Amino acid sequence: MEKFQGYLEFDGARQQSFLYPLFFREYIYVLAYDHGLNRLNRNRSIFLENTDYDKKYSSLIVKRLILRMYEQNRLIIPTKDLNQNSFLGHTSLFYYQMISVLFAVIVEIPFSLRLGSSFQGKQFKKSYNLQSIHSIFPFLEDKLAHFNYVLDVLIPYPIHLEILVQILRYWVKDASSLHFFRFCLYEYCNCKNFYIKKKSILNPRFFLFLYNSHVCEYESIFFFLRKRSSHLRSPSYEVLFERIFFYGKIQDFFKVFVNNFPAILGLLKDPFIHYVRYHGRCILATKDTPLLMNKWKYFFVNLWQCYFSVWFQSQKVNINQLSKDNLEFLGYLSSLRLNPLVVRSQMLENSFLIDNVRIKLDSKIPISSIIGSLAKDKFCNVLGHPISKATWTDSSDSDILNRFVRICRNISHYYSGSSKKKNLYRIKYILRLCCVKTLARKHKSTVRAFLKRLGSVLLEEFLTGEDQVLSLIFPRSYYASKRLYRVRIWYLDILYLNDLVNHE
């Protein structure tokens, strides 16, 4: 974003946060479609696939679009003609897509400048390991072992476009930009049928920005209330009454109730609450009682319904007891496992046994969900039996082999933290046999005949890369003792989920 700072010196736009004039500057379109800023379209997006309308970008299209925006009436087209009405060889929806790309980039400018100014004079150590998805699992192993309940919340999406506009009002102070954004958003989303049929043409950067702004508003309210929440603490020998969360003034509360209870009232803030958000879900881990977990549950329901005007059912908030239930978290099934430990103690001539229980976070592979994903992509059937990949038979042998090896390594890389590797070996077996069947089908041969000819070479391709990585991490003696296959490994270089892992 540093490259934008030199362009924001015109007309006092930077000082007064006027973003609307930027929509009429050609260089902003050039920067918006720059490869460095548009890298989300090259990588696999969480929400949408790669867009292809950016290939049609040219300076002539930008100039015509700017001229058309000066005449705003020409942008208003009936919904039924949105796809048919063309302007210089492109539909009006195409121009709304270009504006959405530009709007996502423009709105990021004041936030990046504000963030950079707040960090001036401060020294921060950058830890790229914390960007990894696997970095959350060691944290949960240390924290969840001391908790007993987890609140699993499905974050709802806003059902009305005006909710998104209202959220942006707190961030963008430029009224012209907000009105223009509202106009383009409504015109862009009116064609509902076209949106459903042509999901691949949508802009992932634009909708990722809208989703993040929506979630940021929700989390700011939640964290504000969480810091100010308290519950009553009563001694066991005094009057017992329910611990109630409240958000009123503490002094007024004491004036009302201090004369009615002979017990000494105490306020206690429970610090043992951890919040983690991933994709469209969030979890709230705590050591509270089931009664307080239910109150947190209905707090989320009331927050979404009353503040965001979103109908949110209580069934979308699940209370899981980690000692009994499994928590589906980032492609893993996590639960607490009790490991009994017997310690023999001896004092002088007497010896006795001490039974201890060690609580450990157990992470398992959801084999049924992954087999369902593999079956959906035609690697196997619904029962987990490998089948040939017919759509890949037109590729070369090396290309087919490299595809299967890459998928197998990615899944093995991600699920290396599983406590039970049996399911991981089953997934590898499905992919290897699917690769053999695909190559045998291409060469019009049987699987047995093909394995006799290239069996050892094929197996070596699947094992070489993974063994080389593990041998660099662990010493040779540890690697040779086969204890490595019982150890959980968390890699700190995984920045996004694979499609087969992202089965939610």
Curated annotation (Swiss-Prot):
For this UniProt entry, the molecular function terms from Gene Ontology, in alphabetical order, are: RNA binding
GO biological process annotations for this chain's record? mRNA processing; RNA splicing; tRNA processing
Compartments, as annotated in UniProt: Plastid, Chloroplast
Q: Which UniProt keywords apply?
A: Chloroplast, mRNA processing, Plastid, RNA-binding, tRNA processing
Q: Mind telling me which InterPro entries this protein's record contains?
A: Domain_X, Maturase_MatK, Maturase_MatK_N
A Gene Ontology CC term for this entry? chloroplast
Q: What is its main location?
A: plastid
TM regions (residue ranges): none
Report the superkingdom from the record. Answer: Eukaryota
Q: Which PANTHER family match?
A: MATURASE K (PTHR34811:SF1)
HAMAP family on file: MatK
* Family the UniProt entry places it in: Belongs to the intron maturase 2 family. MatK subfamily.
Write out the function statement from the record: Usually encoded in the trnK tRNA gene intron. Probably assists in splicing its own and other chloroplast group II introns.
Full protein name: Maturase K
Organism of this sequence: Arabidopsis lyrata
Q: List the top taxonomic levels of the source.
A: Eukaryota, Viridiplantae, Streptophyta, Embryophyta, Tracheophyta
